[in-house]
Amino acid sequence: MEIFPAIDLKEGRCVRLYQGEFSKETVMNEDPVAQAIIFEKLGAEILHIVDLDGAIAGESLNLPVIEKICKAVRIPVQVGGGIRSLVTVEKLLSAGVEKVILGTAALYDKSFLEEAVRLYKEKIIVGIDAKNGFVATRGWLDLSEISYVSLAKQMESLGVQTIVFTDISKDGTLAGPNFEQLAILQKSVGIRLIASGGVASIQDVKKLNDMNIYGVIIGKALYEKTIDLEEVLQVTKLC
């Protein structure tokens, strides 16, 4: 199982939100580059970065910081948030990003998604963020009428190989992932699933591993130290 330590960027800083509420932010590190280096030194093999400003604006606003992170670490970096054009995809890949995560665009701009998948194949990941089972977009501000399962099936049919699934109600809560929705999703599609939101303990990670979930994004639990990164990396290697 892949472990993805998370760095959420807002106004150039590393922050955490509570249930996706931008008004409920906590600054975890004023220097995201330093935080990336810390994760790498602890053994992280890949980083998950979200441009929160970009998710709202619809364009990558933290590109300079992302580029600095890519230059500062030797491990791969995947980035999401505000990626709604091929130009932005190309800028991020040129900056050293390994994979990009499309969210809003996957729902509202299928032609862009299809072209991105055609050009960059496995480098394109789709992020599905759900609230009460329905897909939320534009930085989680808008709630659609499309179920997370329906969108996942559409993405699989378009050639997407990996999905990041987030239950927004769990994000930043340390209340545990939405195992039920993840299980439904896994039965519905045959592509890689990365779980995100609410992961609070090594037991959560072990349960996801037992479900054969491909990867898990861990954010607040690492900063609050309810999960030790070195320990969880060791545990997942032994599973």
From Swiss-Prot:
Q: Where does the record say this protein resides?
A: Cytoplasm
GO BP terms, alphabetized: L-histidine biosynthetic process
Gene Ontology MF terms: 1-(5-phosphoribosyl)-5-[(5-phosphoribosylamino)methylideneamino]imidazole-4-carboxamide isomerase activity
Query: Which residues constitute the signal peptide according to the record?
Result: none
- State the superkingdom: Bacteria
Give me the Gene Ontology terms describing cellular component: cytoplasm
Which keywords accompany this UniProt record? Amino-acid biosynthesis, Cytoplasm, Histidine biosynthesis, Isomerase
PANTHER family reported for this sequence: 1-(5-PHOSPHORIBOSYL)-5-[(5-PHOSPHORIBOSYLAMINO)METHYLIDENEAMINO] IMIDAZOLE-4-CARBOXAMIDE ISOMERASE (PTHR43090:SF2)
Known CDD domains for this protein?
HisA
Reaction catalyzed = 1-(5-phospho-beta-D-ribosyl)-5-[(5-phospho-beta-D-ribosylamino)methylideneamino]imidazole-4-carboxamide = 5-[(5-phospho-1-deoxy-D-ribulos-1-ylimino)methylamino]-1-(5-phospho-beta-D-ribosyl)imidazole-4-carboxamide
Q: Which Pfam families match?
A: His_biosynth
The enzyme's main class, written as a single word, is isomerase
Give the protein family: Belongs to the HisA/HisF family.
What is the species of this protein? Bacillus cereus (strain ATCC 14579 / DSM 31 / CCUG 7414 / JCM 2152 / NBRC 15305 / NCIMB 9373 / NCTC 2599 / NRRL B-3711)
Its UniProt pathway annotation is: Amino-acid biosynthesis; L-histidine biosynthesis; L-histidine from 5-phospho-alpha-D-ribose 1-diphosphate: step 4/9
Query: What is the active site of this protein?
Result: 8, 129
Protein's name in the database: 1-(5-phosphoribosyl)-5-[(5-phosphoribosylamino)methylideneamino] imidazole-4-carboxamide isomerase
The family database entries (Gene3D superfamilies) matched by this protein are listed as:
Aldolase class I
Q: Which Enzyme Commission number(s) are on file for it?
A: 5.3.1.16
